[in-house]
Amino acid sequence: MVVRPLRTLVLIHRWLSIPLCLLFVMWFASGIVMHFVPFPALTEAERFGGLSVFDVSKVRHSPAEAVAASTLKGVTRVRLWQRSDGPVYLVSAASGMKALHADDLRAADIGSEQVALAIGSEHARLRGLNPAAATFVELAEYDQWTVPNGLDGHRPLYLIALNDVAGTELYVSSRTGEIVRDTTRSERAWNYVGSVAHWIYPTALRKDWMTWNVAVWWLSLAAVIAALSGLIVGLFRLRRVRDRIVSPFRKWHAWHHWLGLACAAFVMTWIVSGWLSMDHGRLFSTGALTRSEADRIAGTPAWVELTATVPASLSPATREIEWFAFGGRIHQRNRTGVDAQQLSIVVPASTAPASPFLQADQINVVISHAVGGCSSTSAVAPDDHYFLASEVAPAPVYRSICGDVWYQIDGASGANLEKLDAQRRTYRWLYRALHTFDFPALMVRPKLRSAIIVVLCAFGATFSITGIVVAWRRLKLEFR
């Protein structure tokens, strides 16, 4: 009764696995590398470490004037920092962002490699790197390390090579003049056999996000089908001989059979969760706010009232000022360190004392008014199953529970870090937990977690190598 369906599964497994077996080995091996060397990114500590002291005398226009000059509608944030060529406002809205010089409100886009080189060199010096031999390399829309979508608003990017011992390279946004990415020689080398291989990330493919998204999703689904069909066939091929379970296969094929059954649970969950990493809203919600939700949480801030410029008495420790809309009020965020800041309400004028972070009751009022049906807001414990950290280490992350939906709000900036509905909470376990082993019990035991990941991935790679041998022998038979 099961012969014909089983034969179909054998053929599916065989002809999907022959072209995919090399990919399986690559995925397992590169997964080990990725665990220890993630894809290059500019950390918040690195970004903040490259910020300079304000030249207050050159901040001649107010945030209100910057918002008006930007011509952007629905502004939610304004940021001020000192660039090597003077202080700059960055006005942000859902529709985009615009950088303006704070002394005369001219557009602050970067138009020359000399300015980009000066910005990169100053950033490097402030971080304690050596920019003495820094050179401009190129202006490019994409390269291997700048393909992620989060950089789209900054393209094209100026590449600055420091030519230091570590082989550090910096990327300067042509739109804002910010350093948006850094890499080292070691990071680049390891990532070619790590993230680039694992995510199938060649620049020519990844720069077209839609093509990459569809191609890798279908490729991953084919891998799921190959693994599942192999598991079913492997179970049906088992035989009982004299009270023993035996395999009908010999040599490499037997090794493939037994190893496949032994690591079936890990291989299946890892391949399925890897496929789910490419979901991007296909089966599960994305965790992002809708435009309507974002607008209601921001409220209708009166940017025209933000007419005061930066006072001469500004603390010399201040490296960045941000104004953000939250519940219709404008908060001013003075950052004096990567983990130190002061928040105050400036519009409407308030006599409330400044505090480092937003409080639970403030967030509860805003989210309850914007969304409705909220029962509570409280700080999320670091060992919570759905914890996300703020970019400012000591800052609490608050969770507002509104019916079936949870809103996770950064106490440092008022930003929504993630919207967790039932689908998203399920996705957290099916993808993140199963693919990266970020189970709370393992996250507090990083060495144990690393050991488990390395051992299981090595086991999976070994199993996949037996598949390569079996596939090669099958192909030789087919084309003999």
Residue ranges and their predicted role:
Residues 1-480:
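Conserved histidines in hydrophobic membrane contexts and catalytic metal-binding motifs
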